[in-house]
A protein has these predicted regions:
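Catalytic, metal-anchored helix/loop core of enzyme active sites in primary metabolism
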Residues: 1-182
């Protein structure tokens, strides 16, 4: 109680009770736990719609989408371009994949992260989770979300509108920027 904003970074489905509490009590959430959206899905979306409590994504790609949508109507969106670095194996031939080690997977070419998210990123599992998170956080059908491999990680994501305009958020690959924005 009395919080101006809560940074939610609880892993797994355990994030849902705190997410629900914050929203029902009008406490804005800086969402660093994609699990609240992935596990919560339609329930989390309904809470957001019912309470109208602000949810600000901390993840760089989701923060970029949030920024590109500011002042615009989600119904005007043609598609969301969700970027991915492609991870450390993006240029590997299929034959090379059998020799991948955990140590190799933990050497992300762009970001410095914890072990779980680094492995999830190396296998593109993290991008699958981000597709689900994007779907529920922005209330947009998954068919309107396109993953684009962008190894430089300068374009954090973009939104293409039905009128042909594309808005993108660009910046250095530095997590301090989306954290500060939230």
């Amino acid at each position: 109680e009395g919080a101006d904003i809560v940074l939610l970074s609880i892993l797994g489905i355990a994030a849902l009770p705190a997410f629900e509490y914050c929203l029902k009590n009008g406490i804005p959430v800086a969402l660093a736990s994609k699990e609240a959206m992935v596990c919560g899905g339609a329930v989390a979306r309904k809470l957001m719609d019912d309470t109208r409590t602000p949810v600000l994504p901390v993840d760089s790609e989701l923060s970029a989408i949030f920024q590109c949508l500011r002042g615009n109507d989600i119904n005007d969106v043609e598609r969301i371009l969700l970027t991915a670095s492609g991870g450390p194996f993006r240029s590997f031939a299929l034959e090379q994949m059998k020799d991948i080690t955990k140590e190799m997977a933990l050497k992300h070419p762009t970001w410095t992260m914890g072990q779980k998210i680094t492995i999830d990123s190396a296998t593109m599992m993290n991008k699958g989770l981000e597709i689900m998170e994007t779907r529920w956080l922005f209330d947009i059908h998954a068919s309107k979300i396109t993953v684009v491999v962008h190894p430089e990680s300068v374009v954090h994501s973009a939104v293409e509108y039905k009128d042909g305009a594309v808005m993108a958020q660009l910046g250095a690959p530095d997590m301090r920027l989306p954290i500060e924005y939230a």
